Amino acid sequence: MNLLKKTYVLKLYVAGNTPNSVRALKTLKNILETDFKGVYALKVIDVLQNPQLAEEDKILATPTLSKVLPPPVRKIIGDLSDREKVLIGLDLLYEEFLEREEEL
C-alpha cells in the first residue's frame, strides 16, 4: 500500500450563485468526499467577482472544473453531474484504477 498519497488540486469556476453553479459544486463535493477524501484541495472561483482569475486561466464558460495538480492540467466545461465522465475527463479514473491495482 502506498503511504504517500497524491494531493489533487482542483479549481471550480462558477458565475455567481446560479442553479448550475450550485449543482456543479454539490456534485463535485460529493465525488471528492466519496473518492478522494483527505487528498484534495478545491478552490471555488466566482468569475463575476474575480474576472481576472478567469482571464489568467483562460476560462471561457462556466461551470469549468480544472485539475491543476497532479499534471497535466485537465479541464471540464459544463455539466458535472455524471461522476464517471468527470473522473475520466480529469484523467482521475485511470489513476484511481492504477492505485487500486498496486494495493492488491
Swiss-Prot record:
InterPro entries: Circ_KaiB (IPR013474), KaiB-like (IPR039022), KaiB_domain (IPR011649), Thioredoxin-like_sf (IPR036249)
Coiled-coil spans in chain: none
Matches recorded under SUPFAM superfamilies: Thioredoxin-like
Key word Transmembrane helix present: no
Disulfide linkage: none
Keywords: Biological rhythms
Single GO BP term: circadian rhythm
The UniProt record lists the keyword Protease: no
Residue ranges of the TM segments: none
Domain of life according to the entry: Bacteria
Record family assignment: Belongs to the KaiB family.
Stored NCBIfam families: circ_KaiB, PRK09301.1
Function as written in the Swiss-Prot or TrEMBL entry: Key component of the KaiABC oscillator complex, which constitutes the main circadian regulator in cyanobacteria. Complex composition changes during the circadian cycle to control KaiC phosphorylation. KaiA stimulates KaiC autophosphorylation, while KaiB sequesters KaiA, leading to KaiC autodephosphorylation. Phospho-Ser-431 KaiC accumulation triggers binding of KaiB to form the KaiB(6):KaiC(6) complex, leading to changes in output regulators CikA and SasA. KaiB switches to a thioredoxin-like fold (KaiB(fs)) when bound to KaiC.
Entry text on domains: Has 2 forms, fold switches to a thioredoxin-like fold (KaiB(fs)) when bound to KaiC.
Subunit description: The KaiABC complex composition changes during the circadian cycle to control KaiC phosphorylation. Complexes KaiC(6), KaiA(2-4):KaiC(6), KaiB(6):KaiC(6) and KaiC(6):KaiB(6):KaiA(12) are among the most important forms, many form cooperatively. Undergoes a major conformational rearrangment; in the free state forms homotetramers as a dimer of dimers. When bound to the CI domain of KaiC switches to a monomeric thioredoxin-fold (KaiB(fs)). KaiB(fs) binds CikA, leading it to dephosphorylate phospho-RpaA.
Protein name, entry field: Circadian clock oscillator protein KaiB
